Amino acid sequence: MKKRGFGVGKWNGFGGKVDDEHGEKVIDAAIREIGEETESENGQIGVILLPGDLNKVAEIDFRFEQKPEWSQKVHVFLAYNWQGQPNESEEMRPQWYDISEIPYEDMWVDDEYWLPRVLSGEKITALFEFNENQELLGYKIDSSDFPQIKLK
């Protein structure tokens, strides 16, 4: 559960911004963000990932025409190997769910359109358009040229 910032009160994956100013790569930002967001408030180390642990499964453009500063391109990764466990942090309260019990009603409305596809092994590119009230106006999802992943 997102505890602060954009999307507060919604179940969401770990993530954040790429430090373009210092030449950070997307995969390095993903590794850094999950480390930061799974470290407990008292400094207990959470999840540790290596670049080979991540499989890129989606690139999604989120557009907010009336609030362009909210628009963002999101790179989605799945990990099947990691060290440590996620801890509650100032930003996130993690929770594991069976795929059949994912609480889409408590997530961003777009998640129910793309997340089942990537969890089934498909890799996608997508565009979601929202209004200033965060209501979905339209979307497009395409299978990508990324190679298909093999779920364990």
Regions found by a protein language model. Name each.
Residues 1-13, 55:
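N-terminal strand-loop-strand
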